[in-house]
């Protein structure tokens, strides 16, 4: 991804949050320069757990078609006495017709919620023991406490206010229809480095082309602050 696209995506995310009257924590507004002025000893939880902005094109090179804007608000670390939270929380911003590709989580259970905007469309399929796609097995999920069953690959539509619980090893892909969607993720501890499996090769964190100065550091770039 180009740095200019990342900078613009975070600027746009701030504007969208304001439109939906969603208030964000202070660190969501720290520019790269502002981060350098902070006492990092006071922000160890944010830096160590990579809370903050996460803009990705999943290695596909076309953010408008395949991409996602995330803000990790809370997280923990398994087995850590310093960060014992067993849960995580993220804001998701999904542009109209922008998709997140097929993937599952090996350990994490999560709820994905449509907080407002258009329709959040999702397709589901169980993973096979060798991490393939099980096209035959029926998928049963809970949508706001109501049991729903869908065929593998069938589209489940979440209207604003609806959410679905996704257990581990359940492949899912999703996109927004009719309008932009403000999404939310409530989950077990999140580990994007080790817990994600994508059906097709790609990348969770994008390679970045530095075509303009860094305005917003991504959560995966906090090591720059040590330089």
Predicted segments, located by residue:
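Conserved metal-binding segment of the jelly-roll/cupin
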Residues: 95, 153-179, 183-188
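A short, N-terminal "cap"/entry segment at the start of jelly-roll beta-barrel domains
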Residues: 1-88, 215-221
């Amino acid at each position: 991804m180009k740095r200019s696209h990342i900078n613009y995506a975070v600027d746009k995310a701030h504007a969208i949050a304001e439109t939906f009257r969603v208030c964000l924590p202070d660190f969501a507004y720290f520019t790269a320069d502002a981060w350098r002025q902070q006492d990092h000893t006071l922000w160890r939880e944010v830096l160590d757990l990579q809370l903050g902005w996460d803009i990705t094109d999943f290695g596909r090179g076309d953010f408008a078609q395949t991409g996602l804007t995330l803000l990790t608000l809370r997280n923990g670390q398994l087995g850590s006495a310093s960060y014992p939270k067993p849960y995580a929380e993220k804001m998701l911003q999904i542009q109209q017709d922008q998709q997140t590709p097929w993937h599952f989580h090996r350990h994490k259970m999560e709820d994905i919620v449509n907080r407002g905007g258009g329709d959040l469309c999702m397709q589901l399929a169980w993973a096979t023991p060798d991490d393939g796609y099980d096209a035959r097995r029926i998928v049963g999920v809970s949508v706001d406490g109501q049991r729903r069953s869908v065929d593998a690959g069938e589209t489940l539509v979440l209207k604003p206010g609806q959410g679905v619980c996704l257990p581990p090893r359940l492949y899912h892909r999703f996109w927004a229809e009719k309008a932009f969607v403000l999404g939310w993720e409530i989950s077990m501890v999140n580990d994007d480095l080790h817990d994600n499996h994508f059906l097709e090769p790609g990348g969770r964190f994008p390679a970045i082309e530095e075509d303009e100065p860094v305005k917003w550091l991504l959560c995966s770039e906090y090591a720059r602050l040590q330089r």
